[in-house]
Amino acid sequence: MFVLIYLLIAISSLLAYLYHRNFNYWNRRGVPHDAPHPLYGNMVGFRKNRVMHDFFYDYYNKYRKSGFPFVGFYFLHKPAAFIVDTQLAKNILIKDFSNFADRGQFHNGRDDPLTQHLFNLDGKKWKDMRQRLTPTFTSGKMKFMFPTVIKVSEEFVKVITEQVPAAQNGAVLEIKELMARFTTDVIGTCAFGIECNTLRTPVSDFRTMGQKVFTDMRHGKLLTMFVFSFPKLASRLRMRMMPEDVHQFFMRLVNDTIALRERENFKRNDFMNLLIELKQKGRVTLDNGEVIEGMDIGELAAQVFVFYVAGFETSSSTMSYCLYELAQNQDIQDRLRNEIQTVLEEQEGQLTYESIKAMTYLNQVISETLRLYTLVPHLERKALNDYVVPGHEKLVIEKGTQVIIPACAYHRDEDLYPNPETFDPERFSPEKVAARESVEWLPFGDGPRNCIGMRFGQMQARIGLAQIISRFRVSVCDTTEIPLKYSPMSIVLGTVGGIYLRVERI
């Protein structure tokens, strides 16, 4: 009994100490900040009634003209430097990257192997993994995978055509799920070499498990908040974050795929094959002569896992939001269709790698979609050493401090993007892009830790949208929700319910 009492006193004392130390952090340093909530910090409503983006919009708009390049923020229990000056963001992501190379995210390779993927890794582990994976995402590899994506997109067109009668007015379709089925089949083929066929059979474990990654948590809210606030401690305590059924499904899938390929000596020029080679070689010599260790089964599974979940969700959401905006802006849709059809006529009606790249207005439309609907609301970095902010010698981002770069808020800053709520692809004309700082548009991050799969994600979104817009017209209908409502339970920008649009054959 006394042991239990002493234990409770010790735990209470530790919590009180952590609360006092963390929640007085910015006050002691004289940095502007909002007073934190005892449980939620500056994120009251987290995973309850507020979308992550809203925290960052509101905080940025409150402090962006404060005169400080960064202000204090409490990401739940974790003090963080909230970057309101885009020039400082540029320094952190690019110029002074070596001091902010880590993200400081939870990962526990021993007990929760799927968390040790490229997005979460830090230090030498991240550097080595990035070097291993970079050859998979070259333009040459994209060209090789292009026919595979085209093949899936042709089946995609057939499925839509079957649901849309030739008669006037077409049919009302739920776009979000349809786009997700397309990208699931693409990623399943390119990552695993598996014919998922979710376009024809929407209910599948592959699709269900992919969805769960973005909506389900292994723990309740309090434990989840603890892991987010103290990722290193959570890892030392051997905590896990991946839902058990998701963990079991992907580990079994990867093990079975590897066993089959090694047994049959079957090779494909895909993501999985590169990783299997890294696993088999044990050590790999890079082009610069550096020798790095190979990859064990847990590391391999984690990289395939993140390629799948990041690739299908982000691209499908981008396509859905893009069609939603095109349905409301028929003039933009008509201009885009004219470009696509003109380019196709020059290529005898065939979508090729070169023709997709030639569709410059399509690229502008997608870029504007990613600005207005920023899927990942912020970037995180961690200071590896004390960092004196240039031009502000009394402002220091101390070693170990988390850094938040609110990308979604930059994207809706009226000083950077006049009339930010208006969908306007002209913002991304070549002239305007050249005149803009790269850190003012961050859907894929920037600098050495930008999104390694950017080329692939853009390729599949361009192909899918080109196939749709060249054959169908999308418009709003009575069931189209304007404006959209977003789910606070999703870790990316996801809607509550579907996106319904009228689809008609051209």
From Swiss-Prot:
Keywords: Endoplasmic reticulum, Heme, Iron, Membrane, Metal-binding, Microsome, Monooxygenase, Oxidoreductase. Its cofactor is heme. One of its GO terms (cellular component) is endoplasmic reticulum membrane. The keyword Zinc does not apply. Its main location: endoplasmic reticulum. It is found in: Endoplasmic reticulum membrane; Microsome membrane. Pfam families: p450 (PF00067). Heme binds at C451. The keyword Transcription does not apply. GO terms for biological process: response to caffeine; response to DDT. PROSITE patterns: CYTOCHROME_P450. One of its GO terms (molecular function) is oxidoreductase activity, acting on paired donors, with incorporation or reduction of molecular oxygen. Its EC number is 1.14.-.-. It is a peripheral membrane protein. Belongs to the cytochrome P450 family. Is involved in the breakdown of synthetic insecticides and may be involved in the metabolism of insect hormones. This is Cytochrome P450 6a2. It comes from Drosophila melanogaster. The lineage of its organism: Eukaryota, Metazoa, Ecdysozoa, Arthropoda, Hexapoda. The gene is Cyp6a2.
